[in-house]
Amino acid sequence: MKVYETPVEALQDAMRLSAAMTRKLAVAGLPFGGGKAVIAVPEIPGGEQRRALFLRYADLVASLGGIFRTSSDMNTGEADMDVIGERADYVFGRSVEAGGSGSPAPPTAVGVYHGIRASLSHAFGSDDLDGRIVVVQGAGGVGSPLAGHLAHAGASVLVADIDPGRADAVATRVGGAALPADQLFETECDVYAPCAVGGILSVETVPLLRCRIVAGSANNQLAEPEAAEMLHARGILYAPDYVINAGGAIAIVGLEQLGWSKSELDTALMRIGETLREIYERADARGISTASAADVLAEEQLNVG
């Protein structure tokens, strides 16, 4: 759910998100497609207006008869999925009390954490986070727990958010520091973890980066394909977004559809790091960007059988 300037912008976002979800599930080896929906609103609703909106959306999802399943993402959560579940069975990520597996945000954060460690290992020869500086952009459902995992492992965590109060709260909780949102790109760090809006990596912003690794949960991080090539040319290791942020999708499909145990989920989340290592090795061997290497792997998986 998001405020879009035009219907065309909303449609384009849905198409980009669905393409990324298709690749995400393919690389993760899960037997599902990649349909995505967006809800375009003039402002983010609350209260009864919000409930009515999600009931209308639930009717649409139900009318598709199961060929499309939905879950939470930007500006939505478990409570919204519970509302959808009142009228449609085809929803992932409902609360545990409503028979779901809960929010996909925490497992997404775990997957990003494993991905960051794999990226550190490739870039520096060690996955040790002790003393590493990590800038986490976004203090929401993924950024907040990710900051905690990183700090617990010894990283120095800087948290930025468009809401300074939220950044302060997360930074205080994890023993890090808040970073003004307008200082994201000029702050020297080992890892920049974008965990908020997409399109953050562009031909304008990539030259400003002062990090060795970009690894975060945001969807559609690349504003244009040229940004991936610029990262490659600058020697900045980019963890392809649909690979590193797959933890939430893996969790809801594994737990709710495939009947996984928590142990099986933990193993699957750790494999995100292993997949990234394979992508990095492929990229190095072929002299291509990590984004291109990930796309090749996704196409291989989609063409199997």
Map each language-model feature to its residues:
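Rossmann-like adenosine-cofactor binding region
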Residues: G131, I162-V243
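Hydrophobic beta-strand scaffold residues
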Residues: F68, V157, A178, L237-Y238, ...
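Glycine-rich phosphate/diphosphate-binding loop of Rossmann-like nucleotide-binding domains
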Residues: S103-V191
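Adenosine-phosphate binding glycine-rich loop
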Residues: L120, R212-G305
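N-terminal ligand-binding/catalytic initiation module
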Residues: M1-A98
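Flexible, glycine/charged-enriched surface loops at secondary-structure junctions
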Residues: L25-L30, I67-D73, F124-I133, A181, ...
